[in-house]
């Protein structure tokens, strides 16, 4: 084997050594790229003019309109965390589901899905629900392990439910439409939420001491929950029915018909709304997030806005909501801007480092080496997918999803392209798998977020063990996505709005 063939594996090995040594990822990528670039030039196996393309690549990163969505969604998530949205939803839904065993856990899953569809940021969801719900669940006798697991699992829904930042990054790296990725993610999102609900119901039925119902004294609106729940369910059915009928109308008429149907149904339910304070609070707490979901997600799905434009509208909506709740202050704005700037700088530096590494790696024919290795795996497409899923799962135990997306995904995509695997479906598999990276010990970020806000009586072991069933459920969804490839792709291609 000559030196030219050794360069790609040596580059990869050097990167692994740097990362395991604890050096920052961005600088590790850049250092390996620079060192091996000059080494390749000295050995006459790397064309020096390629390095001249680096400034253009960096300019391309800085001018990428799609990546602007990341700071927008991050800023929106931090503002919403301070706006009182989570508190209102958790309080109202907790009272609504309170009479049921496992009702508080069901409300946490429901609110987790709503927060995921509005913010797309995991940290905000974990900390909000950990601060608000966990003490209440423990107060009324919930098992600490089960309560911690429900909060962890529900918070990670922000990884797969649009407008997830993960899906934006995956779309950018794979070169697929964000709108299509969002549409494809609706199926695993629904499956994940459904499995969470089923798991909570299972625990409530077979381990009732782990998830008791709220006592009557903890429910000021006792006796009104069933009516409020029925009314909210009827809204859902009316909305879905109107949407199904509206599929035969133009896009603008379709959404107008849905809004009109919900408005008429509100008039029908007006006597209930007047007499039932719990129903009023539930509707008032649901309207702001639903408006935000339409601004952020609905406009992307129906093609009215790009993810960047939707993120900008979401920021405006979050600021208005925080102002209406009297939670907007200079301190809140400063904290949101600081957090957004830090994450954006982190992402940009990793992108610059990974671009330099990729430029040199491909310049020494590393892409051919990766393609040969991945396509040579036993089992063909099945063997490749299995290898990638195991690799992503293991990487998720140790490094952040940004690092996986910017370092590993471009290399793995080479094999997917060589095997003619649909990039959208492949990206969706990786996205579902990346959910687990927030829950897997020892470095799952959600575990640390919850540990920081959990009461002292909750042991670290309870937090770690509580997340394991939800890792299993997420992997089960991954299996479903694998076997539902054709239905998912047909759903995306056939998901028109307005016929």
Annotate each PLM feature.
Residues 1-499:
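Alpha-helical transmembrane segments of multi-pass membrane transport proteins
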């Amino acid at each position: 084997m000559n030196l030219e063939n050794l360069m790609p594996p040596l580059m990869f090995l050097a990167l692994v050594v740097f990362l395991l040594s604890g050096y920052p990822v961005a600088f590790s990528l850049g250092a390996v790229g620079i060192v091996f670039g000059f080494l390749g030039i000295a050995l006459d196996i790397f064309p020096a003019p390629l390095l001249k393309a680096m400034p253009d690549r960096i300019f391309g990163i800085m001018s990428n309109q799609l990546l602007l969505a990341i700071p927008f969604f991050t800023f929106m998530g931090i503002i919403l965390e301070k706006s009182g949205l989570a508190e209102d939803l958790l309080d109202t839904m907790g009272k609504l589901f309170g009479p049921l065993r496992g009702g508080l856990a069901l409300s946490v899953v429901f609110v987790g899905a709503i927060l995921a569809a509005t913010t797309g940021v995991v940290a905000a969801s974990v900390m909000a629900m950990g601060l608000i719900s966990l003490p209440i669940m423990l107060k009324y006798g919930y098992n600490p392990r089960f309560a911690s697991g429900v909060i962890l699992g529900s918070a990670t829904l922000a990884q797969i439910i649009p407008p997830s930042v993960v899906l934006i990054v995956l779309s950018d790296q794979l070169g697929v439409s964000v709108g299509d990725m969002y549409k494809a993610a609706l199926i695993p999102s629904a499956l994940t939420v459904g499995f969470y609900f089923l798991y909570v119901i299972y625990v409530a039925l077979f381990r009732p001491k782990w998830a008791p119902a709220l006592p009557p004294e903890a429910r000021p609106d006792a006796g009104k929950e069933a009516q409020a729940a029925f009314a909210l369910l009827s809204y859902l059915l009316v909305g879905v029915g109107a949407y199904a009928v509206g599929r035969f109308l133009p896009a603008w008429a379709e959404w107008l018909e849905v809004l009109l149907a919900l408005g008429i149904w509100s008039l029908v339910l007006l006597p209930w709304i007047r007499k039932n304070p719990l129903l009023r609070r539930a509707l008032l707490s649901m309207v702001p997030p639903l408006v935000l979901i339409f601004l952020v997600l609905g406009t992307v799905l129906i093609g009215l806005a790009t993810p960047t434009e939707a993120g900008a509208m979401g920021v405006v909506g979050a600021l208005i909501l925080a102002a209406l709740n009297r939670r907007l202050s200079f301190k809140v704005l400063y904290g949101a801007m600081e957090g957004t700037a830090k994450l954006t700088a982190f992402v940009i530096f990793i992108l610059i480092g990974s671009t330099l590494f990729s430029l040199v790696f491909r310049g020494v024919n590393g892409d051919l080496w990766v393609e040969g290795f991945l396509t040579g795996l036993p089992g063909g497409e099945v063997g490749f997918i299995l290898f990638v899923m195991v690799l992503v799962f293991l990487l998720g135990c140790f490094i952040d999803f940004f690092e996986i997306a910017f370092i590993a995904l471009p290399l793995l995509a080479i094999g997917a392209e060589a095997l003619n695997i649909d990039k959208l479906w492949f990206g969706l598999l990786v996205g579902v798998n990346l959910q687990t990276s927030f829950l897997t010990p020892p470095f799952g970020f959600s575990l640390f977020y919850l540990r920081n806000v959990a009461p002292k009586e909750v042991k670290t072991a309870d937090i770690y063990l509580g997340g394991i069933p939800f890792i299993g459920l997420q992997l089960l969804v991954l299996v479903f996505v694998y076997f539902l490839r054709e239905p998912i792709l047909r759903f995306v291609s056939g998901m028109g709005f307005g016929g």
